[in-house]
Amino acid sequence: MKKNTLIFLIVLIVFVWVLPGYRESMDIIAGFTPAMTMVIDAGHGGQDSGACAKDGTKEKSITLSIAKFLQKEAAGYRVSAVMTREGDDGLYDDYSTASGWTKVGDMKARRMIMDDSKPQLVVSIHLNSFFSDESVHGAQIFYPTNGSPETVAKNETLARTVKELLRTELPNAGDRIILPKKDMFIFREAAFDGLLVECGFLSNPDDLNMLKDEEYQKSFAAALMKGIAANYNLKKL
């Protein structure tokens, strides 16, 4: 009996004092107050492939991969990340027809997820293409101009902060200027901050090779999250 008690005490000491990280992880698993909620929108999906490279690489596949890596990075900052999709599926709502998926229904369903999640931020992940000039390359960030002047100013500041972190962390991602963008459906009259991130050009051979590389996808997601964290003063665990 004494031997069992001694073993129990030793195990308890290890978990309480030697493994503080374990205790923190258990706090997270058991339930914690997130620093903020963010919706990650992986562009396209299902029968909507988005842009397509000459080698058949589809935008929808890479956006989902980067979105999942961003979700993992977000957890390291105690950010609750909600995904609009987690597989190769289109989204549906009342605008979908009896025969199946529609683009309008897909966009409405994405916006419904965003509104229901009550996030502070929505990040929509996309890829670009411009086959008439394959030299055009680089990631680019757009910020929505729907909303009050205060909201637009916040989105512009966020875009600049994220762009600077991408430029610093990933020089190969390019140095394209941030741009305002009107009439993005998912950001119309939104109560949340928003960014649309074009991660590179499928039409550019160098961008394509990087975007297909899983390690680059991870690095891109990490740099993107660092920029978000810098804007919202989030600390990494």
Regions found by a protein language model. Name each.
Residues 1-237:
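Catalytic-site microenvironment of enzymes
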